[in-house]
């Protein structure tokens, strides 16, 4: 992680989010976002854009729960902060959910004072796995499920419920398998196979900031290791390593029908 003062300021901006969540300080949490900020939680669901929508998101998913952030690693790359973590969410019925997650915060300078604000928050976690965990938690889990539905409908409306459930769609296990195939091909220095796994105009980066050519990427990521793969929407996030460096990788699949199942973007953050 960069040790420059500006990187420290970016990280402090991001760390204010779990602090406000833990304190149940809605005004502070909502105020961390830029004027037209957005929350994608989970990635693949309909984003919550603007103060009113973010406020309703807080009322639905944060206010009724006790949420603890267990952060394992932070990476600052350009104006983005990536977090590798597990979230422990205790619902009103007492059931606690353990949710493996990667977070990406895109930060901007916003307002007359050019204060650092969160422009976009992307939460990569698996909605299907969370629902399975909740339903498998016995009577407390079933009761929590029964309460969550009306909460969603009250705060988000029918369209909001449908937008949230969009998070159930996506690349799932097939996407995670494709990412593992990419890592294996890179490790074998099998550039032809790497090429078949990427869409023709794939965006590649070894640091989440600078674009890399296919040759540069294949050479620089030849020892890429991937772990903790999470499928969210059309993306897979992963804990990645190169040598002794640990970071977060974001793998975005193409929506181009001419290149089905290929990766449109591979961004590695260290």
Regions found by a protein language model. Name each.
Residues 2-270:
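C-terminal and inter-domain tail/linker signature
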């Amino acid at each position: 992680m960069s040790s420059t003062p500006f990187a420290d300021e970016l990280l402090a901006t991001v760390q204010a989010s779990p602090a406000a969540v833990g304190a149940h300080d809605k005004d502070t949490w909502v105020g961390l976002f830029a004027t037209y900020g957005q929350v994608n939680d989970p990635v693949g669901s309909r984003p919550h854009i603007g103060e009113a929508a973010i406020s309703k998101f807080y009322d639905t998913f944060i206010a009724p729960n006790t949420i603890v952030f267990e952060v394992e690693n932070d990476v600052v790359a350009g104006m983005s902060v990536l977090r590798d973590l597990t979230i422990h969410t205790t619902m009103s019925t007492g059931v606690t959910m353990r949710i493996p997650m990667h977070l990406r915060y895109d930060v901007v300078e916003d307002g007359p004072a050019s204060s650092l604000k969160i422009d976009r928050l992307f939460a990569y976690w698996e909605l299907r796995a969370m629902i399975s965990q909740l339903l498998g938690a016995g009577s407390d889990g079933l009761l929590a499920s029964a309460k969550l539905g009306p909460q969603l409908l009250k705060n988000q409306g029918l369209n909001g419920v449908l937008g949230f459930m969009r998070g159930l769609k996506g690349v799932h296990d097939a996407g995670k398998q494709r990412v593992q195939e990419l890592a294996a091909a890179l490790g074998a220095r099998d550039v032809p196979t790497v090429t078949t796994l990427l869409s023709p105009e794939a965006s590649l980066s070894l640091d989440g900031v600078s674009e890399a050519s296919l040759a540069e990427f294949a050479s620089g990521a030849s020892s890429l290791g991937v772990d903790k793969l999470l499928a969210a929407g059309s993306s897979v996030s992963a804990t990645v390593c190169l040598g002794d460096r640990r970071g977060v990788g974001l793998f975005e699949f193409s929506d181009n029908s001419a290149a089905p199942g290929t990766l449109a973007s591979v961004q590695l953050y260290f």
